[in-house]
Amino acid sequence: MAGKLQAHNIRIRTFIHATEDPEKVLEALETLFPEEISPKDVEFEVIETEGYFGNPILVVDAEIKHSRNIRKFLENLRGLLSKEDRKYLWEHAEEKVDETGTFYIRFDKQKAYLGEVKVSEGEDVIHVRIKVKAFPMKKEAVVKAVREWLEGED
């Protein structure tokens, strides 16, 4: 049975480039969210900025803070991960967790738009940062908690 991962908050970020349809990018983001979490349960912020060559970019930030919604998001996310992606994240947990206890995952934005959740190390991604609760709050404890969450039956 998979362990339960507890978190203080979850932050999701992606970029909308001038060549992309904002509605499609937002649909890709929705792929990560369970139906039980409504948009009013998530703090969204959109920031307009420019790329290196002056091209317009929208930065979309979403944050989940309430424990009930965090729990639902994490349960849903684990269910969306393929066995291969869970294995990959388990094997790379040391490098995907920082000293502050944040677990970083990147998902392929194009595949998410098609309804598929796929871990990616590419550039065109949806960034998910999970601020994990662990005791003691040390990297080793967070890595252990993340690995326990990733383990288990389908």
Swiss-Prot record:
Keywords: RNA-binding
Superkingdom as given in the UniProt entry: Archaea
GO molecular function: RNA binding
Keyword RNA-binding: yes
Record note on quaternary structure: Homodimer in solution.
PANTHER family, per database record: EXOSOME SUBUNIT (PTHR38816:SF1), EXOSOME SUBUNIT, DUF54 FAMILY-RELATED (PTHR38816)
Function: In vitro, binds efficiently double-stranded RNAs in a non-sequence specific manner.
Record-given protein name: RNA-binding protein PAB1135
Source organism of the structure: Pyrococcus abyssi (strain GE5 / Orsay)
